[in-house]
Design a protein with these regions (language model features):
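Hydrophobic targeting segments
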Residues: 5-11, 26-28, 33-37
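Active-site-proximal specificity loops/subdomain of glycosyltransferases
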Residues: 44-91
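Short beta-strand/loop segment that forms part of the nucleotide-sugar
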Residues: 32-40, 61-65
Length: 217
């Protein structure tokens, strides 16, 4: 962490035991605090996460989705209400199979830079990888096993993930982009940018339909 800014990555998990260590180490390497919400685990995930929590590596909170409620939506509601979110300056939501790759920086603090900021959020392309011609599970490091992906111009590689500033200024988080901004998107310091610093044009056309993909490289 920098002295001035706290970066939080939040995720929901259920029975992700074999993949937890790699994911946690990856995001700690990038400089994130980690918040994990689990539901209905039947493997050793909760024991492992509790051990990480006892060591101070992350915060683990259980949650129970309501009947008929998608687990991810329950997770995101749990996250937005958690004290770690209110204490964070920047929040990123990622699943356990999603790894943020920084090409020109070693940490998220180096990429975002010091305050003051003239942008509200930064978006990253969500690149999809295939199964590497494997037809069954094999133990190993995820980011080294699956290295083949679709070309960048394909539609499924146009989706985004978002790290956002002042998360409590939104009604709720989203898998790709948050919902219900309380501020004014037209304000100069509420831009949405790419990692290169370019402003993303027309990133939100209607209040209830936030961006999920971009046509920019």
């Amino acid at each position: 962490m920098t002295a001035d800014q706290r970066f939080l990555v939040a995720t929901g998990m259920r029975n992700e035991g074999p993949f937890i260590v790699e994911w946690v180490c990856w995001y700690r390497m990038l400089g994130f605090d980690i918040l994990v919400a689990t539901n209905d685990c039947t493997d050793y995930s909760t024991d492992l996460l509790n051990a990480f929590a006892a060591a101070g590596w992350l915060t683990h909170v259980p949650h129970k989705p309501r009947e008929g409620q998608p687990p991810q939506r329950s997770t995101l509601r749990k996250v937005i209400k958690h004290p770690m979110t209110s204490a964070a300056d920047w929040v990123l939501h990622c699943d356990v199979d999603e790894f943020l790759v920084l090409h020109k920086h070693d940490t998220i603090a180096e990429l975002i830079g010091p305050p003051p900021y003239d942008f509200q959020a930064m978006v990253f392309n969500w690149k999809c990888f295939g199964n590497g011609d494997w037809d069954k599970y094999q133990d190993g490091i995820v980011h080294r096993q699956f290295r083949r992906c679709g070309m960048g111009h394909l539609r499924f590689n146009r989706s985004i993930k978002t790290i956002l500033r002042k998360p409590l200024e939104f009604n709720r988080l989203g898998a790709h982009f948050p919902h219900g901004f309380h501020g004014d998107w037209s304000a100069a310091d509420n831009r949405v940018v790419t990692p290169s610093g370019a402003t993303l044009p027309q990133f939100q056309t209607r209040e209830n339909h936030p961006i999920r993909m971009t046509t920019q490289d």
